[in-house]
């Protein structure tokens, strides 16, 4: 078979298959061109999910007629000259416009700033229809109609108009976050108008426009640098999470990317604080010398390659974990909204009490007085489990621990999480704060405290064990016993000493001392299930902290146990002193805060 040179039109159509996969790809390329031209206002209009119409208008520098003629030819660009080592623009390949023109009907009207007039060029299926002077405002208008009309086979692989429109919206959101100084407007017959006014240097304000006010209220600022690589941005508190990773945004030298290394680093940073199947919200911006970065990995320019990927990953993980630790026990502010909905969901519109309430009197109150709650120097850090030794475990009831007037030593204003006032259903602590109240899940909170103690002891190699007077025998399938014994040494590092006890049984002889009384049966069975997913001892060694979290869950104060007032206050104080105590080891919130203003809203007083 004879080798021959392909036609320019066919070459462009092949390139379009890599660069322009769908309408959103075309929108991305055109918006990048507008930003590279210095635009401060970009308007995008669509119809039919971008397949029928995609128009991008900007107020950038514009082009002369001679520039328009070159702009639709492959590898013609004003952005680079003779090297790929110092790319500082979003586009540089010179493929977008010729690729679009080869598979769609493309028209470009432009006028350079300062020029007396503009020009227009039209292309359809790779053929130039006309190039002529035209009236135009300074800037550029690129209009794409009938995308893929020249390659109808590609149309079969596109999604519904609604899905394609949503993909364009996502592209605009990413660009809007990356460039807060630019005004973006997205409109069309297939969508409601979306507008992001310019916010200048206030990046958090732009993120609030795109991600919602809740993100602004639950975001932690990041600013870290290592070996001339700088990381800035915002990350949500662990309890402010979503069911997918669509709200994770990454930018490298201002370029929106969907890089696996960065996304993996985000997951790693939140590994101990978010439940399985949930994803944090984060907006990260990495700035580094362009020479340390390869953006020419893929024609779509959505992937990048770092010269030192380990440095970048370490910077991201370290910065996020340090920021989370700095925030301490902070939890998501959205809990109050959920609580308000729960309180009000049972009332129909216009509901009113059938009769006025009787005046309050001490005799009418169901509360019974008790001694004031004070900590007396008691610390959960010193005795995380022993505080509950000897307490009874009554069945959960609706009645609460009664209330008395607080003493000066326990005034709510002195503590972020306030002073304990009651215990509900032997599981929830109600504390009064300076401006509202807090409801604490006692098991989840203590679980986190125990885990942090175990992790600290593990890192310092001082995790002591306690010998059981009578070994706990756990019956397991033989294969589970074999798996556990492979990792006996690693479990021993955590203070859990196990050995075989005949066929199908494991003997637990020592448990971590700080756990106090441990549910050894449940702990060993859960560890057996988890270890089944790991293959080597090194895999377990890397997951020792995860195992510690499992142990902490089984060694924490259980639901249904009544606490004394001083124990409740000691738990609150320890939460305030422990980083990450706003969520348990599974990522669920340990407390919900309700502001006084929220309570007043419930009673119509606002």
Curated annotation (Swiss-Prot):
One of its GO terms (cellular component) is mismatch repair complex. Pfam families: DNA_mis_repair, HATPase_c_3, MutL_C. InterPro entries: DNA_mismatch_repair_CS, DNA_mismatch_repair_MutL, DNA_mismatch_S5_2-like, HATPase_C_sf, MutL/Mlh/PMS, MutL/Mlh/Pms-like, MutL_C, MutL_C_dimsub. Gene3D superfamilies: 3.30.230.10, Histidine kinase-like ATPase, C-terminal domain (3.30.565.10), MutL, C-terminal domain, dimerisation subdomain (3.30.1540.20), MutL, C-terminal domain, regulatory subdomain (3.30.1370.100). It comes from the Bacteria. The keyword DNA repair applies. GO terms for biological process: mismatch repair. Keywords: DNA damage, DNA repair. One of its GO terms (molecular function) is ATP hydrolysis activity. The keyword Kinase does not apply. Residues 350-371 are annotated as: Disordered. This protein is involved in the repair of mismatches in DNA. It is required for dam-dependent methyl-directed DNA mismatch repair. May act as a 'molecular matchmaker', a protein that promotes the formation of a stable complex between two or more DNA-binding proteins in an ATP-dependent manner without itself being part of a final effector complex. Belongs to the DNA mismatch repair MutL/HexB family. This is DNA mismatch repair protein MutL. It comes from Rhizobium rhizogenes (strain K84 / ATCC BAA-868).
